[in-house]
Amino acid sequence: MWRLKIGAKGGDETHLFTTNNYTGRQTWEFDADACSPEELAEVDEARQNFSINRSRFKISADLLWRMQFLREKKFEQKIPRVEIGDAENITYKDAKTALRRGILYFKALQAEDGHWPAENSGCLFFEAPFVICLYITGHLEKILTLEHRKELLRYMYNHQNEDGGWGIHVEGQSAMFCTVINYICLRILGVEADLDDIKGSGCARARKWILDHGGATYTPLIGKAWLSILGVYDWSGCKPIPPEVWMLPTFSPFNGGTLWIYFRDIFMGVSYLYGKKFVATPTPLILQLREELYPQPYDKILWSQARNQCAKEDLYYPQSFLQEMFWKCVHILSENILNRWPCNKLIRQKALRTTMELLHYQDEASRYFTGGCVPKPFHMLACWVEDPDGDYFKKHLARVPDYIWIGEDGLKIQSFGSQLWDTAFSLQVMLAYQDVDDDDDEIRSTLIKGYSFLNKSQLTQNPPGDHRKMLKDIAKGGWTFSDQDQGWPVSDCTAESLECCLVFGSMPSELIGEKMDVERLYDAVNLLLYFQSKNGGITVWEAARGRTWLEWLSPVEFMEDTIVEHEYVECTGSAIVALARFLKEFPEHRREEVEKFIKNAVKYIESFQMPDGSWYGNWGVCFMYGTFFAVRGLVAAGKTYQNCEPIRKAVQFILETQNVEGGWGESYLSCPNKKYTLLEGNRTNVVNTGQALMVLIMGGQMERDPLPVHRAAKVLINSQLDNGDFPQEEIMGVFKMNVMVHYATYRNIFTLWALTYYTKALRVPLC
């Protein structure tokens, strides 16, 4: 029986270290004797239901840990479901009852350290690199036990498409990148190449898909790097990734410090392996894979021609003639000059040393999380190549369990955890509910624990040493996406957490306990002000430094805007909300700067509105998500339906897209297509519906014509399950426009948040 453990050390404690006693850490352990027959039957039923319905519902409901927590807390929903007939007849009591049912359920899912656990996954290129890395280093069976491997195979099979391939994400059409690396993953896990049946391996169908689409030479760059590392592709067939970039002066636009932090972290590990032309020691399996992945003999492949090949299914960001010429020039420089005597001795070796110095610094500063699950195995392998028995590699191994998540669909690798992000929003919901029912002491302990988690998770220092020289920006005052140990501050995580802390700070100490020191609130404000660009928008991880024209040269084929840091509407909206509240609570602290920030941020948001009244969402699906954060920011800045044309246009967009049921449902295709796209059959999604409902209420729709709001509320109330949960529907997160991410708690957060708005709106006429 798999169990989620919170805040546990576990594993190799010698090579595991923390900044705050592992607050927020999530790891899974298997104990065959830790369950009753009834519990095991419940888990098996959840697994079977997912497999049976996987063609219809492609993402998990994240049930295993939820069932565990509900059992441990002896949760029982005692409030009957509310069923709404006529939307116009919803009463305050109906709304509050549905809200209370959901709050009591959601409260039971809080961990003892104050955070809300959840999976943050869904990308199908997250798992295989870990398996490949552990296979090459000889640690596969040490890190991934038999039970781990069983669950990983379950996940692979559950998310294989009918045509035999795997998509970039669990709802996506088959793509070469994920089909190739997941095929390799199956083979490493012991699945025979020709074994194939509906319930079996799927290897033969995957191989057929690969060969029918031209073979593995059509894999995108990141996939080609992994194939080259494994020895089933040749480095000469890759676009160059020279380590010399880390030696360029700071005034160079190509200096590594100007890169987007996540791409920089990936590029750092890959460039070391590329610079050394590292190739794994051939094994019988590797030799077999060379024959299985290509329609032609391996020794007949023209690697120089394969360099720019990419399957049309993967090619989201087409490579222009300018790009091809640029990378051809870089290849000539890298291979014909820097990789030959005497430059290979004078420059390349120094570049490799510089790269590893930077890589070790980044790893130490993130407690060996690195930037996420994509750079992590590259960094881990680079450390092993440098010293197979060294502490750097062992420290990486110790953090692998932090990336593993177990759901009813199997074992998946997380981005790196969304503990802080989910918790900040969950606390927004709980605080809003407290405002609805301030006599309810049932959630007091929930609020206290949540506030404690935020307090313990804030970054209180900048990265160590000369962090600028080591390509790290400031961090003090920020909150991360996951936990404090990961160490990367994120602007909207900081804003949402600051907003919560400001609300907590306004509450009586006898209710909430010891309050956060005001200087730490100032630190958070300082960081948000620092993240604002000249155009008024807010970046995500670091201040914008890179030239945007560098995106024209991007070698990444399946994502967009990956080279330099950009500003985002959602981050900007969250920052306005937090700073507007801060201005009310602390009107004398950097007042002019905060007011200027809000003024410029409002202009930025207004300037990015689409002609139809919506805003494109960069981190969620998509126009509903972006519009919610944009309107929320504008309203916090004092804008209303009456005095703000963008809000009027946004409300009109929401009204025009409401379906006959009364809800909203947006397809993930809106993200890559950059055009509002309905779900098939114009069906409803409760997350989109919650976001849209809040936009309408913030836009004053209840005062003009409340019926659209009542209809939306009816959808949410009637969707609620017997235990107070809401149904898991389509995937709702996105990364760089084309990679979808699963946020399992969104179905609780945005529905309950919307019901707090609605319940308060119904209460107003009674006051």
Swiss-Prot record:
Recorded hits in CDD domains, A to Z, give:
SQCY_1
Question: Which family does the UniProt entry place this protein in?
Answer: Belongs to the terpene cyclase/mutase family.
**Would the keyword Nucleotide-binding turn up in this protein's UniProt record?**
no
Top enzyme class: isomerase
From the UniProt record, which GO molecular function terms apply? Answer: lupeol synthase activity; oxidosqualene cyclase activity
Superkingdom of the source species? Eukaryota
Instruction: Report the function annotation for this chain.
Output: Multifunctional enzyme that converts oxidosqualene to lupeol, bauerenol, alpha-amyrin, taraxasterol, psi-taraxasterol, multiflorenol, alpha-seco-amyrin and beta-seco-amyrin.
Alphabetically list the UniProt keywords.
Isomerase, Repeat
The active site is formed by D492 (proton donor)
Q: Which GO terms describe its cellular component?
A: lipid droplet
EC number(s)?
Answer: 5.4.99.52, 5.4.99.54
The organism that produces this protein has a lineage beginning with: Eukaryota, Viridiplantae, Streptophyta, Embryophyta, Tracheophyta
Recorded hits in Gene3D superfamilies, A to Z, give: 1.50.10.20
User: Which NCBIfam families does the UniProt entry name for this protein?
Assistant: squalene_cyclas
> Which Pfam families does this UniProt record tie to the protein?
SQHop_cyclase_C (PF13243), SQHop_cyclase_N (PF13249)
Question: Catalysed reaction(s)?
Answer: (S)-2,3-epoxysqualene = alpha-seco-amyrin; (S)-2,3-epoxysqualene = beta-seco-amyrin
Which biological process, per GO, is one annotated for this protein? triterpenoid biosynthetic process
Question: What is this protein's name?
Answer: Seco-amyrin synthase
PANTHER family in UniProt: ARABIDIOL SYNTHASE-RELATED (PTHR11764:SF49), TERPENE CYCLASE/MUTASE FAMILY MEMBER (PTHR11764)
